[in-house]
Amino acid sequence: MAASVLNTVLRRLPMLSLFRGSHRVQVPLQTLCTKAPSEEDSLSSVPISPYKDEPWKYLESEEYQERYGSRPVWADYRRNHKGGVPPQRTRKTCIRRNKVVGNPCPICRDHKLHVDFRNVKLLEQFVCAHTGIIFHAPYTGVCVKQHKRLTQAIQKARDHGLLIYHIPQVEPRDLDFSTSHGAVSATPPAPTLVSGDPWYPWYNWKQPPERELSRLRRLYQGHLREESGPPPESMPKMPPRTPAEASSTGQTGPQSAL
């Protein structure tokens, strides 16, 4: 009897050890209470820039020279997009709710760069030196919001005279194209101008047929007053007026009006 009881106890010992091992597992409370990090928490916030009031001093500092050198701020920027063809429009903005998105544009990625109409050296990097045209946003990679600020700042800088731009003056060439090439010559006048005839044939007087005239006379017999012939070749010229006659008419004019 005692042996059978001992055997049953020994058989149940491994099952008890398994239950004990399962109860001894300790789960930390931190893993059960914490939430997964959201996308907004993973984004970095915008730090405060020391050059906010005077942004042009940053472009003269050694930090700027070490980071960019003599190249524009957008020279080494590459857009992150799907496929081999980039979209024709950049993102609307790189900073949402004071959080910077991934791969921000050349201006939003450096918190020490500020778009201001007094920051002339920064504005000159986004204007073509030959034509004076502002570079498009897909060319420089800046977001739509920063591109709008750049356009307004460049226009304001031009109005204040801080950003110099010129319109090239092209001098006309003093060449006579009629003699510059053998195949080019003076255009001959029209044949109608040489003969003295009008340019259009319907402007010339044509005598209507006599049969048509007789028919019209019978039709409008009671309404015709006089018959008009062909128009005169030239209008009659009025004799020139002497200065004395012109002055006398000018003096009598106001009196007759009264």
From Swiss-Prot:
Keywords: Mitochondrion, Phosphoprotein, Ribonucleoprotein, Ribosomal protein, Transit peptide. Residues 1-35 form a transit peptide. The keyword Cell division does not apply. The keyword Transit peptide applies. One of its GO terms (molecular function) is structural constituent of ribosome. One of its GO terms (biological process) is mitochondrial translation. Gene3D superfamilies: Ribosomal protein S18. Residues 245-258 have a biased composition (Polar residues). Residues 216-258 are annotated as: Disordered. Residues 229-242 have a biased composition (Pro residues). PANTHER family: MITOCHONDRIAL RIBOSOMAL PROTEIN S18B, SMALL RIBOSOMAL SUBUNIT PROTEIN MS40. Component of the mitochondrial ribosome small subunit (28S) which comprises a 12S rRNA and about 30 distinct proteins. This is Small ribosomal subunit protein mS40. The gene is MRPS18B.
